[in-house]
Structure formats: structure tokens, C-alpha cells
């Protein structure tokens, strides 16, 4: 057996190497456990077969309903504000545009933006149509627009040609007569020229007084009386005045009754009497 080396026999270099090796090797000793008691959280143990309570508190349901109602109210207010802003920007009322939409039998529904776009497009079209007509009026050195300005604008502009049936181009009747495009009698020609000079827009024509009436067929054995139509017409225009009776016309004296009775007997004597057996 080898005897252990004595401590004195170790060199200084060997002692230094042993110290270095002891510093390089990690310590495997476990940490010291403190003697103080640390608090442990209490955990409730649940049984695996225990029924779970999934019921929701009624207060939470009411809160959700109130929140949804508030959101709906906010959306309605925003839509109303948008409608008011759109109506302020348009001169045409949106309600009238919706009524025009509903006149179409194939109409079902339209969004608010579609109604607004239709109103805006209508205003822009009317503005363009008026500007084109105003240019033609200024060419004639006039400040007021006339029908011929709109009709000439439709005839001259390709973009407005679709209105040719709605706004047709017209010509004064006097020019047509002078150019012999329209033939009229001399009497009618004078009347038309007078109308052109006075610039009458509308002429009211009275219906004839003696209108033809359909006569219904009479029954067998009946006959129509031959009254003149002129008398009936004059009577309808100028009826005879009605004479009012007075009390003195109704009340008669005794002398008047005697005279009238004598006259009646004389008239009967003069007449021929036919006797029937």
C-alpha cells in the first residue's frame, strides 16, 4: 500500500493548482432552506361531475339592451343630421323626389344617397339648360328668357337633343303665312295678323248656343210638335217677364160677374152644337 504523501512534501505550485481547480468546479450543494413558513395560496378543488352554473345575471342583460338601444338612437340621429345637411345643400326637397320615385310602378326602394344624387343631378341639368338658353337670349339682346330660347337650345345642342319631343321648335304663324308654308283664308289671315301684333297668348272660344242634341225615338202613336227652334232660343236668352198678380185682379165685383155671364151665354148661342144620339 502506498502511504499518503506528507503535507510538507507538496510544492507551492501544486497547492496553487489545487486551489484553481476547486474554484473552477461548480458547487453541487443544495441551497439552504429557510426555517420560516411561507404562505401557500388556497385553491378550491372542484369535483369533476359537479354541475356548472352558466346563468347570466339579469343586470348584465339589461345593460346590453340599453347599450344597443343607445347605439340605434345614435345611428338614427346621425342619419337625420346627414339628411338635414343634404337638404340644406339642395334646393329641391328630398321628400318630393321620393314621391316622384314612387310614381313609377316598378319602384321598390331607394337609398338616401341615391335620392340625393338624383336631386343634385336634376339641379345641375336645369342649371346647364338655363345657361344655354340664356346665351341665345343675349344674342338677341334680351334679358328675359322665352320659349323659343329653350327650343332653340334643344335644337342646337346635341346633349339636349333628347328633349326635342318635349320642347319642340316653333315658328310664328305670321312667318309661316308669309313664307306660304301655311294656307289660310283672307278673313282668318287678318285675324291671325291682329293676334300676332297684339301678342295674345291664349284665345278663348265660346261654344255655340244652339248645340245639336240627340232626339230620342218616340213611342208608337206619339208625335213631336213643330215648334220653331228660333223661338226657343230667343226665349232662353230673353225670357218673357212674369207678371205678378194683385189682390184686385182676383177679387171681382157683382157687376163684373153679371157682364161676364151674359157674354158667355151669347157666345154659346152663336156656336153650333152637335147632338149625339
UniProtKB/Swiss-Prot annotation:
Protein name in the entry: DNA polymerase epsilon subunit C
Function, in words: As accessory component of the DNA polymerase epsilon (DNA polymerase II) participates in chromosomal DNA replication.
Keyword Nucleus applies: yes
Record's miscellaneous remark: In eukaryotes there are five DNA polymerases: alpha, beta, gamma, delta, and epsilon which are responsible for different reactions of DNA synthesis.
Subunit details: Heterotetramer. Consists of four subunits: POL2, DPB2, DPB3 and DPB4.
Pfam family, one: CBFD_NFYB_HMF
Single GO molecular function: protein heterodimerization activity
Location in the cell: Nucleus
InterPro entries: CBFA_NFYB_domain, Histone-fold, Transcr_DNA_Rep_Reg
Highest taxon of source: Eukaryota
Region (Disordered) residue spans: 1-91
Comp. bias intervals (Acidic residues): 69-89
GO cellular component term of the entry, any: CHRAC
Gene3D superfamilies: Histone, subunit A
Gene: DPB3
Keywords: DNA replication, Nucleus
Compositionally biased residues, Polar residues: 1-16, 24-39
BP terms from Gene Ontology: DNA-templated DNA replication
Amino acid at each position: 500500500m502506498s502511504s499518503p504523501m506528507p503535507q510538507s512534501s507538496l510544492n507551492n505550485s501544486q497547492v496553487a493548482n489545487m486551489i484553481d481547480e476547486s474554484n473552477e468546479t461548480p458547487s453541487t450543494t443544495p441551497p439552504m432552506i429557510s426555517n420560516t413558513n411561507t404562505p401557500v395560496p388556497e385553491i378550491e378543488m372542484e369535483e369533476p361531475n359537479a354541475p356548472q352554473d352558466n346563468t347570466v345575471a339579469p343586470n348584465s342583460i339589461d345593460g346590453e339592451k340599453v347599450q344597443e338601444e343607445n347605439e340605434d338612437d345614435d345611428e338614427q340621429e346621425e342619419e337625420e343630421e346627414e339628411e338635414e345637411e343634404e337638404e340644406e345643400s339642395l334646393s329641391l326637397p328630398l321628400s318630393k323626389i321620393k314621391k316622384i320615385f314612387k310614381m313609377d310602378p316598378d319602384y321598390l326602394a331607394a337609398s338616401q344617397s341615391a335620392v340625393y344624387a338624383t336631386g343634385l343631378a336634376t339641379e345641375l341639368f336645369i342649371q346647364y339648360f338655363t345657361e344655354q338658353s340664356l346665351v341665345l337670349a343675349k344674342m338677341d339682346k334680351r334679358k328675359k328668357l322665352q320659349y323659343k330660347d329653350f327650343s332653340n337650345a334643344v335644337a342646337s345642342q346635341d346633349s339636349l337633343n333628347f328633349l326635342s319631343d318635349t320642347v319642340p321648335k316653333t315658328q310664328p304663324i305670321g312667318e309661316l303665312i308669309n313664307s306660304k308654308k301655311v294656307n289660310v283664308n283672307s278673313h282668318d289671315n287678318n285675324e291671325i295678323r291682329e293676334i300676332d301684333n297684339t301678342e295674345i297668348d291664349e284665345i278663348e272660344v265660346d261654344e255655340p248656343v244652339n248645340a245639336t242634341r240627340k232626339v230620342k225615338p218616340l213611342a208608337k202613336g206619339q208625335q213631336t210638335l213643330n215648334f220653331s227652334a228660333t223661338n226657343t232660343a230667343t226665349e232662353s236668352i230673353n225670357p218673357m217677364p212674369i207678371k205678378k198678380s194683385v189682390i184686385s185682379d182676383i177679387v171681382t165685383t157683382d157687376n163684373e160677374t153679371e157682364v161676364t155671364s151674359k157674354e158667355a151665354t151669347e157666345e154659346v148661342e152663336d156656336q153650333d152644337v152637335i147632338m149625339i144620339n
